[in-house]
Amino acid sequence: MLLLSREDIKKVFSIQEAVEADKKAFTLVADGKCDSPLRTKILAPKYDGCFLFMPAYAEEMEAASLKAVNIFPRNADCGLPVCPAQVLLIDGKTGVVTAVLDGTYVTQLRTGASTGAAF
């Protein structure tokens, strides 16, 4: 299994590539070729936090993914990220997890790239 940190991703994946990836993803969704159900939200009221889970499956790409974004505002008080996130990449043929990525950076890239993909 591949483990990719923010630094690893920066070395191999540019914002231009992220824009192109977003365009492909939007096309797959628009064409009904991607199963991307609504995200699941689980509250952690004791800690003023929540867990968000966003799965997707694209048969054409033989791939699935799961992004977990956790929002815990109190983390700022102890020097931890407020929105830590991870992305699991999963082989669509076998169900085996093939990579774990820094989801915080991936989310930042995707947010910017979505704007670029719109033009």
Q: What are the residue ranges of the model-derived segments?
A:
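N-terminal ligand-binding/catalytic initiation module
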Residues: 1-110, 114-116
